[in-house]
A protein has these predicted regions:
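Hydrophobic ligand-binding cavity/cleft-lining segments
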Residues: 1-43
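A short, structured loop/turn motif at beta-sheet edges
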Residues: 19-20, 49, 74-80, 101-110
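Hydrophobic pocket/interface hotspot
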Residues: 22-23, 32, 56, 73, ...
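Glycine-rich portal/gate segments that line the openings of hydrophobic small-molecule binding cavities
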Residues: 43-87
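Short, highly charged C-terminal tails/helix-capping segments
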Residues: 44-45, 151-165
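Short glycine/serine/proline-enriched coil/turn segments at secondary-structure junctions
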Residues: 63-65, 90-94, 148
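Beta-strand/loop substructures that line and gate deep hydrophobic ligand-binding cavities in soluble
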Residues: 88-140, 163-164
Length: 165
C-alpha cells in the first residue's frame, strides 16, 4: 500500500532489574506470552526464532476472536538493542518498525522504546484528516504499550502479572 503516513512513538521506562532480564523478556516465548500483545490467560500462540531474519508470532484470543501479531528480527545485540517489524495482518499489511534500546543504570536499567507507526489513509483525506489519524493512532498505540510495559515491569520485578486476562 502506497497511501500512508508515519508517526514515531518513543517511550522510556526504568526497571529494577538488569538489562539482560528485560532483553530476554522480549525474546523468550514463555515470558512473551505473559505480556507482549497478549496475556497468559488469553494467549494461544507465542513463538519466535530470535535471530536476524527470524520471525515471531503472537496469537491472542479475546471475546472469541483471534488477534495475530507477527514480525521479523532485523537486529539482535544482547542485552543492548533489538530491532524488529510488527504487523497485525487482519487489520493491515503495513509493517511498523520497533527498536528497543537498553542501558544499564546504577540500579536496574533504562529501556527506550521507539515505534515507527504506519497509518493508512484514504485517497480523499485532507491534511487535517491525516493529522487527526496520526494523532489518534499515536495516542492509542502509546496507551496500549503503556499497559504492556506496566505488565512487563510487574512480571520482571515480582515474577508474575496480577492481571492474566
Amino acid at each position: 500500500m502506497d497511501n500512508y503516513s508515519t508517526t514515531t512513538l518513543t517511550m522510556t521506562r526504568n526497571f529494577d532489574v538488569a538489562s539482560k532480564r528485560v532483553f530476554d523478556a522480549w525474546l523468550n516465548p514463555e515470558m512473551m506470552r505473559k505480556w507482549f500483545f497478549t496475556l497468559e490467560g488469553t494467549n494461544q500462540v507465542a513463538q519466535n526464532n530470535p535471530q536476524v531474519g527470524g520471525t515471531w508470532e503472537i496469537i491472542d484470543r479475546r471475546d472469541g476472536k483471534d488477534y495475530r501479531a507477527i514480525g521479523e528480527y532485523f537486529e539482535i545485540d544482547p542485552p543492548k538493542k533489538l530491532t524488529f517489524t510488527f504487523k497485525m495482518p487482519q487489520f493491515s499489511e503495513l509493517e511498523d518498525t520497533i527498536t528497543v534500546e537498553l542501558k544499564e543504570l546504577e540500579q536496574g536499567c533504562e529501556m527506550t522504546f521507539t515505534q515507527v507507526i504506519h497509518v493508512e489513509q484514504e485517497e480523499d483525506w485532507t491534511e487535517s484528516d491525516i493529522e487527526k489519524a496520526l494523532v489518534e493512532t499515536h495516542d492509542g498505540t502509546e496507551q496500549g504499550w503503556n499497559y504492556m510495559f506496566m505488565g512487563l515491569k510487574e512480571l520482571l520485578e515480582t515474577g508474575k502479572i496480577s492481571y492474566t486476562g
